[in-house]
Amino acid sequence: MMPSTTLSTVLSDINEFVVKQGHGVKGLSELGLQTLPNQYVHPPEERLSSMDVVSDDSIPVIDVSNWEDPKVAKLICNAAEKRGFFQIVNHGIPLEMLEKAKAATYRFFREPAQEKKKYSKENCPTSHVRYSTSFLPQIEKALEWKDHLSMFYVSDQEAAQYWPPSCRDDALEYLKSCELVSRKLLEALMQGLNVNQIDDSKESLLMGSRRININYYPKCPNPDLTVGVGRHSDISTLTLLLQDDIGGLYVRKLEHEAWSHVPPVKGALVINIGDALQIMSNGRYKSIEHRVMANESNDRISVPVFVNPKPNDIVGPLPEVLASGEKPVYKPVLYSDYAKHFYRKAHNGKDTIAFARIE
């Protein structure tokens, strides 16, 4: 435990220690805190209590060992429409590769603060790599109990030059291994939207860009007072999440105030529909609010891969969806504009989708 005088100095300027010096929330947690710093205390309405959780409800787990089976596509489309979240098993990515991605996450976050801060907004020479804490610490009223490293994939050459050596090779290998799974998922989902083939223009729109994050949620002295990640929906087409065996991801039930825990399943990937696909499907597929809760017993990690349109793509309801005369619910928007809108404010549920909604 850090001496009380030093601890009080750190607590007097959390931003300096956590953000500027690069220690992150992990460094704060390792000081031996007995109580949560005020900067991380969230208002009661943003905390999740046991009364809000539906204990007997879980999202679907789909065996995708035979992608060509029409029943698999039907299960995927049904889950996308009714839940927005599902898990897949037997997806073809070896368990060893999943474990290597987790190990790479631990390696990076165990680096000294001075090494990690090389990848902060202030120090990194590229905007495609970013080490940060919380979501938008500069504007959030209450900070999230989380550190993360985000790596936007441009090319192998750029990754070799800018991604942290401690996690680069395994993170890149895992990101690439998710590409085939993403395509198979999208082929199934497009069947439900009367899109028979993913041509070059559709491929750009659906999966033109990719980003991998590695997330670290340290154990917390007062987890009931804070959040790991606040309520939000992703702006991606799809998100493929690898989580460890700790748990802590909660998903809102469609049209309910209740939340469901997403239990870790060994070897599984958690799949969720993003805002971009909700817009493209004209609301048929659901991008659902989710959040991560802190815990006091264990550190937790996760590795999401975000499959997105290209920044210069126009995202709107697909022509095939509207071909039967269905009225559009969303207007076409430039994806980069939509993303900027998302990153301009703190997490607040599904507020971002209103940016594309036709009034």
Curated annotation (Swiss-Prot):
Similarity comment: family membership: Belongs to the iron/ascorbate-dependent oxidoreductase family.
Co-factor: note: Binds 1 Fe(2+) ion per subunit.
Documented EC number(s): 1.14.11.61, 1.14.11.62
rRNA-binding recorded as keyword: no
Function: 2-oxoglutarate (OG)- and Fe(II)-dependent dioxygenase (2OGD) involved in scopoletin and umbelliferone biosynthesis. Converts feruloyl CoA into 6'-hydroxyferuloyl CoA, and p-coumaroyl CoA into 2,4-dihydroxycinnamoyl-CoA, but has no activity with caffeoyl-CoA.
Residue intervals of the Fe2OG dioxygenase domain: 201-309
Associated pathway: Phenylpropanoid metabolism
Regulation: induction: Transiently induced by fungal (F.oxysporum f.sp. batatas O-17) and chitosan treatments, in association with the accumulation of umbelliferone and its glucoside (skimmin) in the tubers.
Binding site for Fe cation: H232, D234, H290
Annotated 2-oxoglutarate binding sites: Y217, R300, S302
Keyword Oxidoreductase in annotation: yes
Pfam families, A to Z: 2OG-FeII_Oxy, DIOX_N
Tissues and organs where the protein is expressed, per its UniProt entry: Mostly expressed in underground stems and stems, and, at low levels, in tubers, leaves and petioles.
Enzymatic class: oxidoreductase
Catalytic activity: (E)-4-coumaroyl-CoA + 2-oxoglutarate + O2 = (E)-2,4-dihydroxycinnamoyl-CoA + succinate + CO2; (E)-feruloyl-CoA + 2-oxoglutarate + O2 = (E)-6-hydroxyferuloyl-CoA + succinate + CO2
Keywords: Dioxygenase, Iron, Metal-binding, Oxidoreductase
Single GO biological process annotation from the record: coumarin biosynthetic process
Full protein name: Bi-functional coumaroyl CoA and feruloyl CoA ortho-hydroxylase F6H2-1-8
InterPro entries membership: DIOX_N, IPNS-like_FE2OG_OXY, IPNS-like_sf, Oxoglu/Fe-dep_dioxygenase_dom
